Design a protein with these regions (language model features):
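Conserved catalytic cores and adjacent C-terminal regulatory segments
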Residues: 1-237
Length: 237
């Protein structure tokens, strides 16, 4: 569909245009064959899906149902055949930035921008949106005994400049790379169904170990598909 064939640069700028931080983005696509154009006026995709994991799973499931493709031996809702890696962009959730006593005296401006430089209402909506999806997806996979097929890597302990979304200095970029690389050495964690908080799962090793296992599964699946005489996949998507 030519009118949906947007430049990747426009897509990236649009989905990063967080309200109050960065400006909304406009671009236009054109169907050269018909001359028709389509205008896009967009802001950060996180406004509707700050954690797009569940949306992605739904889209894949929908595609399998619509296309009637037999990519699952047990049907499109057989989650044992899904491998999901969810990479968070970090948050400052663990930092005690606000208290009910403080918020009780806030007016409109304080909710939008605190004296410490944070945006309380935006931070709260963003975190709750992402955390709820992580909780729901994690519980879904656990309930279906496929918890090892879902890997969430997220740092909720960001502080200072690293916790901002609009500081693109060389120093901050290098710090974020350091934090990201450090996450590989951390123990795999999974949401506790009672508390809703992530807890370490030592027996599954580090995030790097889990990624290696995922990579092997995908590699084995690709080899199986390529050698299948019928051209049908055997397991994971």
């Amino acid at each position: 569909m030519p009118l949906k064939d947007a430049l990747l640069s426009d897509v990236c700028i649009s989905t990063s245009a967080a309200p109050t931080y960065l400006p909304a983005h406009f671009f236009q696509t054109k169907d050269e064959a018909t001359g028709k154009t389509r205008d896009f006026n967009l802001i950060d995709g996180g406004v509707s899906a700050n954690n797009p994991t569940l949306l992605t799973i739904n889209q894949i499931t929908r595609k399998m149902i619509v296309d009637k493709q037999d990519l699952f031996t047990g049907g499109p809702t057989d989650y044992d055949k899904f491998l999901v890696i969810s990479l968070g962009t970090g948050s400052a959730k663990n930092a005690a930035m606000y208290t009910a006593k403080d918020a009780a005296g806030w007016g409109i401006l304080s909710w939008l921008h605190s004296k410490e430089g944070y945006t309380p209402i935006v931070d709260m909506f963003s975190y709750s949106s992402a955390a709820l999806v992580d909780y729901n997806v994690s519980i879904l996979f656990q309930a279906l005994h496929s918890e090892k097929n879902y890997l969430r890597i997220q740092d909720d302990s960001l502080k200072g400049t690293a916790a901002t979304v609009d500081v693109a200095t060389k120093e901050n970029m290098e710090e974020l790379v350091r934090i990201g690389e450090g996450m590989l050495a951390k123990t795999v964690s999974r949401v506790d169904m009672e508390t809703g908080k992530p807890v370490p799962v030592p027996e599954e090793g580090t995030n790097a170990d889990a990624l290696t296992r995922f990579a092997k599964k995908l590699s084995d699946e690709r080899k199986a598909r390529m050698t299948s005489s019928q051209g049908k996949p055997s397991s994971a998507l």
